[in-house]
Amino acid sequence: GKLKKIRWGILGAAKIAREQVMPAMINSESTELVAIASKDLKKAHFLGKKFNIPKIYNKYEDLIKDPNIDAVYNPLPNHLHVPWSIKAAKEGKHVLCEKPISMEGSEIKELINTELNTGKKIVEAFMVREHPQWHKAKSMIDEGLIGEINAIQGMFCYHNIDPRNIRNDPNIGGGGLLDIGVYPIVTTRF
């Protein structure tokens, strides 16, 4: 039979959600965008109209309590990843959380315990782990087609000098290392 579509709720109106994830979701046969929550209600209404999302919330709490949502996408600022992912799972939702899933290693145990106690998946959204180009590169390395790895040098950068940008505030975004430094680290471990 036909697979049931996963009904998604989006927490916030982050750029990654607006420009990458939500467009991908509306083009997928297995997903349905059913709700968005943003503290900026004007932005939520705009995105609701743009992506044909029927429910608009101005409180994250209301979205995660919606019984018509199966899974939540969490692209909130980094310091909010753990608390809102846990709250969503405790409300019976699976969670796809943007990277880094936490700002402290000690928070990972709490995420794992929440998964075990709720039976809901909490997964970190990391393009490196799922993109076909990286799978191809990994298989070429595994098959010995491009030699043996002896050392890895990685660099990932962008120009962002706006002091108001969350990526530049170590207290809420973790600073450059947690925001983009994770890419070369995760890629080498992949």
Predicted feature descriptions by range:
Residues K109-M127, E148-I152:
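Rossmann-fold dehydrogenase core element
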Residues T31-A35, D70-V72, G174-G175:
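Short active-site oxyanion
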Residues S30, N52, N68, L145-E148:
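Glycine-centered tight turns that cap/initiate beta-strands
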Residues V128-F190:
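Predominantly a Rossmann-like dinucleotide-binding segment in NAD(P)-dependent oxidoreductases
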Residues Q20, F46, K59-D62, A71, ...:
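Alpha-helical elements of Rossmann-like donor-binding domains used by nucleotide-donor carbohydrate transfer enzymes
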Residues F51-T114:
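Beta-loop-alpha module in the N-terminal Rossmann-like domain of NAD(P)-dependent dehydrogenases
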